[in-house]
């Protein structure tokens, strides 16, 4: 037996939840489908936990100005890596809980915690249930991919899905890819005492187009950790 709906939304991340809000203005015949981790990429493993660790790093980095401001004892301050990660994870959990409490937690039968696959253009198999929808919105997002040649290194390879699950900070870290995410995490971890090396095959960092700005950015970031 098939369930008939006007709209099926695959993916309960930021895009999928936004789609729900738009669909609800037009119809109450819809389902939201997601069999993976809930709470949005931004709140779980993206911009929110990254900003938490960036703030910790900025707070610690600022100790270098204390003597100038008449504050003594900066040289005796130190980072407790386990406490840093516990703090970041506590904030991350708060962010995720707030997302869930205002989205999927309030849904009834409209939310289905299963994976979907297409049987026909308008027919989905969701778990062991068939759902036919007049319209299907695909909002599955993306996830990091580890090249097959690198997989032999096992848990030495970290992605943005892994790094905020660490119980402590690594002693050293190579950041491969110096886009916005690589730069902000590389700088933050370097400021917290991790020996960071940045690696990118491009001649510019942060996708900066202006040659003069790109050159200055490389000089400034290069003072914090080496760039290859």
Q: What are the roles of these predicted feature ranges?
A:
Residues 8, 31, 174, 197-198, ...:
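A structural signal for isolated positions on well-ordered beta-strands in alpha/beta enzyme cores
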């Amino acid at each position: 037996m098939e369930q008939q709906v006007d709209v099926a939304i695959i993916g309960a991340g930021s895009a999928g939840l936004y789609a729900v809000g738009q669909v609800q203005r037009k119809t109450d015949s819809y389902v939201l489908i997601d069999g993976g981790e809930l709470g949005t990429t931004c709140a779980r493993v993206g911009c929110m936990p990254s900003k938490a660790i960036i703030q910790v790093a900025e707070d610690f980095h600022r100790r270098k100005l204390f003597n100038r401001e008449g504050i003594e004892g900066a040289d005796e301050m130190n980072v407790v890596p386990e406490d840093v990660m516990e703090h970041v994870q506590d904030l991350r959990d708060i962010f995720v809980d707030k997302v869930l409490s205002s989205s999927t937690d309030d849904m009834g039968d409209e939310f289905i915690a299963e994976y979907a696959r297409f049987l026909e253009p308008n027919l989905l198999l969701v778990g062991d249930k068939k759902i036919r929808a007049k319209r299907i919105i695909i909002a599955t997002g993306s996830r990091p991919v580890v090249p097959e040649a690198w997989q032999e290194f096992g848990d030495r390879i970290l992605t943005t899905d892994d790094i905020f699950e660490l119980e402590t900070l690594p002693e050293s870290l190579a950041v491969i890819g110096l886009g916005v995410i690589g730069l902000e995490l590389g700088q933050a971890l370097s400021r917290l005492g991790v020996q960071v090396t940045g690696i990118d095959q491009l001649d510019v960092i942060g996708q900066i187009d202006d040659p003069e700005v790109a050159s200055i950015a490389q000089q400034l970031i290069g003072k914090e950790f080496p760039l290859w």
